[in-house]
Design a protein with these regions (language model features):
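Transmembrane alpha-helix signature in integral membrane proteins
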Residues: 2-30, 146-152
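Transmembrane-helix boundary motif in ABC transporter permease subunits
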Residues: 16-47, 59, 161
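Hydrophobic alpha-helical transmembrane segments of polytopic membrane proteins
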Residues: 21, 91-99, 168-189
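Generic hydrophobic transmembrane alpha-helix motif, especially the helices
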Residues: 46-98
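Membrane-cytosol interface at the C-terminal ends of specific transmembrane alpha-helices
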Residues: 82-124
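Transmembrane alpha-helices
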Residues: 131-160
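Non-cytoplasmic
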Residues: 149-177
Length: 189
């Protein structure tokens, strides 16, 4: 049945989107209120992590999970799905890491653009605090930009989900690709 793999993939996708939004917003808040040196360092780290291919990131997380298990005997993240078992935490973490930094960079760019606008200077002149200006004005005005770029983030996550399902032996939405006859694919095209 297609319903179970679809709901499993949808759960992973939803968890990834939720984790991505929460983490990217928290990173931006931390970044915004940090000293200038730390802000530059954080931007460089985000750029570096975003340049790592998703396949390598997935393997690194799997290896890290196995390394922790070998050292401590504690299985924090189940590295693969076997049989009818489903893994949830590892796919969500693996799918979230790169989109978190992509979304962080989108938010940061949008916040930088908003800071240049006149209403921010006016708010400072009125005596509003940096915190009030950020949460009440800047962050609220950046949501339009964030949601207009959401489609790129979603396509990136879906394409990574295809790779992840294969690497982690997940029985998700894209599992139908494994057992299809080439004639069936040709007819579908």
């Amino acid at each position: 049945s297609l319903k179970d793999p679809f709901s499993y993939s949808l759960l992973i996708l939803g968890g990834t989107l939720l984790a991505t939004f929460i983490a990217a917003l928290l990173f931006e808040v931390f970044h915004y209120f940090s000293p200038r040196i730390l802000q530059n360092f954080f931007r460089e780290i985000a750029f570096f992590i975003q340049s790592i291919p998703d396949v390598i990131m997935i393997f690194a997380i799997q290896l890290f999970s196995i390394w922790i298990f070998k050292k401590t005997g504690l299985l924090i993240l189940d590295p693969v799905a076997l049989g009818e078992d489903h893994v949830y935490l590892l796919p969500i973490i693996a799918l979230s890491i790169l989109p978190i930094f992509m979304l962080f960079q989108m938010i940061d760019l949008s916040v930088s653009e908003e800071q240049q606008k006149m209403y921010v200077e006016y708010a400072y002149a009125k005596g509003l605090s940096k915190r009030e200006i950020f949460f009440k004005h800047i962050l609220r005005n950046t949501t339009i930009t964030i949601f207009s770029n959401l489609q790129y983030l979603l396509w990136f996550i879906i394409s990574s989900l295809l790779i992840l399902e294969r690497l982690l032996n997940m029985d998700g939405l894209f599992s139908f690709i494994n057992g299809l006859d080439i004639k069936f694919i040709a007819v579908g095209l």
